[in-house]
């Protein structure tokens, strides 16, 4: 079983992790419903590309 020969230092570990970044989700304005929604996904009111395709989610 392979084991590291040397312990990875905090600096080395943190330099490697500098590329792990959180990006903001892409949000578009839906003119049909007047709400903002994520791209390429059905809105909460059941619309996709301006067409009704699903029943709206029930409010609990």
Swiss-Prot record:
GO molecular function annotations of the record: structural constituent of ribosome
Family matches, as Pfam families: Ribosomal_L32p (PF01783)
Domain of life: Bacteria
Keyword Ribosomal protein applies: yes
BP terms from Gene Ontology: translation
CC terms in the record's Gene Ontology section: large ribosomal subunit
Keywords, sorted A to Z: Ribonucleoprotein, Ribosomal protein
Protein family according to the UniProt entry: Belongs to the bacterial ribosomal protein bL32 family.
NCBIfam families: rpmF_bact (TIGR01031)
Designated name of the protein: Large ribosomal subunit protein bL32
């Amino acid at each position: 079983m392979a084991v590291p020969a040397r312990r990875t230092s905090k600096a080395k570990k943190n330099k490697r992790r500098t590329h792990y970044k959180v990006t903001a989700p892409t949000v578009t304005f839906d003119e049909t419903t007047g709400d903002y929604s994520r791209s390429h996904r059905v809105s909460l009111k059941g619309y996709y590309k301006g067409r009704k395709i699903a029943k709206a989610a029930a409010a609990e």
